[in-house]
């Protein structure tokens, strides 16, 4: 008896110690771990919120839906065995991930066109509609299983909301009132769904965790790694055109030696003449006059210098100027008057990189020909010709442009509004460290009436960085941007302008 009496205090001490150990509730993350339903539903609802909200800055319109896609995948992965409808949600989430992630990777390349992007967006929207329909019916089945009324009003409202948003996008709705009302409704719907999830949790509804070979963390890391590797490969290998570079035939120059000498005597720049094809040289046979203008353009920030100047009132002021020690791009424009009763000029726009700027993807020449600047004075006559060249280890290589001709597009300008343009474009790519990268575009302008200014413009767009998302070409950027520095691209402008009667350039 005494031994048992001595054990009672020990038992009391153990019970007291046990009570002290459970005085506090476990941390929230522990609670979430033991309530898989709550964790899965939170992932689903946050995933839906991120997938349906578009913030068009800092690439959030791509980043947030990508995170939302992963959350939907993980959330429905845990719920897929609850009923056939939630299993359908998981299938839709997998298919959407298979659509969204390749699209994100392809956005680092210039491969997908507008039609491809539109098709991917349509497939993604259709899968989201199917997912929301399954989610609505899946929640109704869950409520019935939990002994609650079979209602899924919040999910049904979300389905109707998404259908209406698709309709507004299809008709290109531009008003402000309806989107604000839709945003308010969206917030209310999400609150309703969170309350529904909490009500099921409080009613004691639970799901049994299923053993999986790949944890959620591992799956998310694999998706992130695949996305990172895919985007890196896209930037490195998918950002430039495939050019047909061939060694230049030096013997071509001897075929037009007499015409070459005639053009040189008239003042045709020899550096430009050396890059012309025999056909473009022969087109100038019997030339009457040559007009040429050359400008060097910087593609660097230069350096700032200060100097003193008079203010005109006896005082002195300090003036800051930017000085460019290096001007990397040389643009030369040449006009050659051809023989004949009708005044006709052959116009050449030539570029030469005097130093290696580093080529990161695509380049583009945009030409505003004389008939576009002065339609009453000039007409376009003949085809557009040209090529690009570069040197490597003492050997010259040539290639045709990726495309050469008129491109019709719609531009939106602050000053002129939305209008349709049709310009000459010559897009191309150069090897990463091409030497003496150069090229030209040529066309013929015939006079409609005499004494009209011949004004021909050349805009050169250079890609100065790999980092842009989504990736666009220099030509696409030129169609939508102004001159100067525009993110990964920089555009400079050059013109050949003169009155044919005196052949004196205006600049």
Write out the residue ranges for each language-model feature.
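Membrane-interface extramembranous regions at the lipid-water interface
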Residues: 2-58, 63-108, 129-168, 183-220
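Membrane-helix interface segments in multi-pass membrane proteins
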Residues: 52-65, 102-125, 165-182, 230-250
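Internal/C-terminal transmembrane anchor helices
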Residues: 208-242
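Short extracytoplasmic/periplasmic juxtamembrane "stem" segments immediately C-terminal to an N-terminal membrane anchor
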Residues: 247-268
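Short N-terminal edge-element motif at the start of the domain
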Residues: 268-385
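Flexible coil/linker segments and helix-coil junctions enriched in charged and small residues
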Residues: 306-320, 417, 425-429, 474-478
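Short helix-loop boundary/capping segments
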Residues: 371-449
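Extracytoplasmic/luminal low-complexity segments enriched in Pro/Gly and acidic/polar residues
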Residues: 421-507
């Amino acid at each position: 008896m005494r031994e048992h009496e001595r054990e009672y205090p020990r038992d009391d001490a153990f019970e007291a110690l046990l009570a002290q150990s459970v005085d506090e509730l476990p941390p929230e993350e522990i609670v979430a771990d033991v309530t898989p339903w709550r964790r899965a539903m939170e992932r689903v609802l946050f995933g839906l919120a991120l997938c349906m909200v578009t913030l068009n800055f800092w690439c959030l319109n791509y980043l947030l839906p990508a995170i939302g896609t992963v959350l939907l995948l993980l959330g429905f992965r845990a719920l897929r065995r609850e009923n056939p409808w939630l299993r359908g949600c998981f299938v839709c989430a997998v298919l959407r991930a298979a659509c969204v992630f390749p699209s994100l990777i392809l956005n680092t390349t210039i491969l997908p066109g507008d039609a491809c992007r539109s098709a991917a967006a349509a497939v993604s929207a259709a899968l989201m509609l199917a997912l929301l329909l399954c989610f609505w019916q899946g929640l109704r089945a869950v409520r019935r299983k939990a002994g609650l009324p079979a209602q899924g009003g919040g999910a049904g409202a979300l389905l109707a909301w998404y259908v209406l948003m698709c309709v507004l996008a299809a008709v290109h709705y531009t008003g402000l009132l309806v989107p604000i009302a839709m945003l308010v409704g969206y917030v209310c719907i999400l609150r309703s769904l969170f309350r529904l999830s909490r009500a099921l949790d409080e009613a004691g509804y639970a799901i049994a965790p299923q053993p999986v070979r790949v944890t959620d963390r591992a799956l998310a890391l694999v998706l992130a790694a695949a996305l990172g590797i895919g985007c890196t490969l896209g930037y490195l290998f998918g950002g430039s055109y495939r050019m047909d570079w061939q060694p230049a035939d030096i013997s071509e120059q001897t075929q037009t030696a007499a015409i070459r000498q005639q053009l040189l005597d008239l003042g045709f720049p020899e550096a430009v003449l050396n890059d012309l094809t025999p056909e473009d040289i022969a087109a100038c046979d019997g030339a009457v006059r040559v007009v040429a203008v050359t400008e060097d353009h910087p593609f660097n920030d230069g350096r700032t210098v200060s100097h003193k100047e008079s203010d005109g009132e006896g005082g002195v002021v300090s003036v800051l100027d930017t000085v460019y020690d290096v001007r990397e791009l040389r643009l030369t424009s040449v006009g050659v008057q051809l023989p004949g009763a009708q005044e006709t000029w052959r116009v050449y726009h030539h570029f030469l990189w005097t130093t290696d700027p580093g080529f990161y993807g695509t380049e583009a020449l945009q030409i505003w020909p004389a008939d576009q600047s002065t339609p009453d004075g000039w007409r376009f006559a003949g085809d557009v010709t040209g090529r690009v060249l570069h040197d490597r280890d003492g050997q010259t290589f040539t290639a045709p442009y990726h495309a050469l001709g008129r491109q019709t597009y719609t531009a939106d300008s602050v000053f002129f509004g939305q209008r349709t343009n049709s310009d000459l474009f010559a897009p191309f790519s150069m090897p990463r460290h091409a030497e003496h990268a150069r090229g030209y575009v040529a066309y013929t302008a015939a006079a409609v009436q005499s004494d009209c200014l011949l004004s021909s413009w050349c805009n050169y767009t250079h890609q100065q960085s790999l980092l842009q998302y989504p990736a666009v070409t220099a030509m696409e950027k030129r169609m939508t941007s102004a001159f100067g520095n525009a993110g990964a691209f920089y555009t400079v402008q050059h013109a050949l302008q003169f009155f044919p009667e005196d052949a004196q350039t205006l600049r």
